[in-house]
Amino acid sequence: MSPQTETKAGVGFKAGVKEYKLTYYTPEYETKDTDILAAFRVTPQPGVPPEERGAAVAAESSTGTWTTVWTDGLTSLDRYKGRCYHIEPVPGEEEQFIAYVAYPLDLFEEGSVTNMFTSIVGNVFGFKALRALRLEDLRIPVAYVKTFQGPPHGIQVERDKLNKYGRPLLGCTIKPKLGLSAKNYGRAVYECLRGGLDFTKDDENVNSQPFMRWRDRFLFCAEAIYKSQAETGEIKGHYLNATAGTCEDMMKRAVFARELEVPIVMHDYLTGGFTANTTLSHYCRDNGLLLHIHRAMHAVIDRQKNHGMHFRVLAKALRMSGGDHIHSGTVVGKLEGERDITLGFVDLLRDDYIEKDRSRGIYFTQDWVSLPGVLPVASRGIHVWHMPALTEIFGDDSVLQFGGGTLGHPWGNAPGAVANRVALEACVKARNEGRDLAREGGEIIREACKWSP
């Protein structure tokens, strides 16, 4: 090796491990409007300073690796690196802190939730220097939001398609979710829709099993929709689950649903994947189908307090990827704090502009500009006696999704649907008359019982 080569190597590159904070911890950094901002809850290994761990998260989720590499000199690290720009303690948790990281927009492919998550959470969660890591929130800049189509139609267009205004929509998941033949399944759909529901729903794990192949289910459910519409004069729908083992089979099911002229299909967006979901969302926009989203598998990701990802992040990702409805759980019977957190991400689904509000778990102000909103679906163990609370908490722009609360009626499926519809209309009427649903809810439902099975 010549002396000249040795000199260049010595000046331009020095191998070895160095502290992340020397490069990736930048408390003086002023965030840009185009940066994607992330709030991580970090639980480090003992003895590691917060600045080093916050910088490690920024490095390992952007341009960094465990050592200096000679190709660092071939690019502009300052332009592309993630930066940990702020660290704050978690109240009541001595060993945890929130690390705020800013990512330059050029790190991400336009219109790809898949790439965004691969970059931000794809690798760093296995980092052994951390005991636990949780992504609490993301700020998606307007410049990146505008690269996404978002929901196929959104709240207002859905109401126009259904010609239903001024109240929450009503749905029911058909039970038992597995084991029914296609014909008996279609019968239950018809009875619920005829009784007064707006939608019925495939359960998330109803795909195309030996006891009920997807094409048979689609045909019998379409027949139930046609018949109930003719008898009630209302537009009805059934969430036909298009989720499949391949994207090709998923699209085949969506195409068949369009040929049947039904209004809505369904997708399990976490198990199906964001690439598949975005593909289906684009098809639904182009072909006039509404898209209902189920969040099956979400608790694997969001249930642990210290590790994983909060559902508000998954909700934001869904709004970008595309869906007209998504299950948001229900706050009935929950603690007040949980209610505030839930309604925080419900607002992130529906509203155009949401201010930072840490009391509701919103770490960043989020501007969705022209991206359509998503209807939150309140489900899980609800029945008619919850209707006053649900109407008050979720408001008109929501779907109230029953199951046993409809099908468990002692007189049958249709009377159960009638009871749901009568209870909802009684609550909406009482609210519009100025009555206090929280205080008078029980009385309102008892009055409605006179006109309901």
From Swiss-Prot:
The record marks K334 as: Transition state stabilizer. The disulfide bond which can form in the large chain dimeric partners within the hexadecamer appears to be associated with oxidative stress and protein turnover. Its main location: plastid. It holds the Pfam family RuBisCO_large_N. CDD domains: RuBisCO_large_I (cd08212). This is Ribulose bisphosphate carboxylase large chain. Keywords: Acetylation, Calvin cycle, Carbon dioxide fixation, Chloroplast, Disulfide bond, Lyase, Magnesium, Metal-binding, Methylation, Monooxygenase, Oxidoreductase, Photorespiration, Photosynthesis, Plastid. The modification N-acetylproline is found at P3.
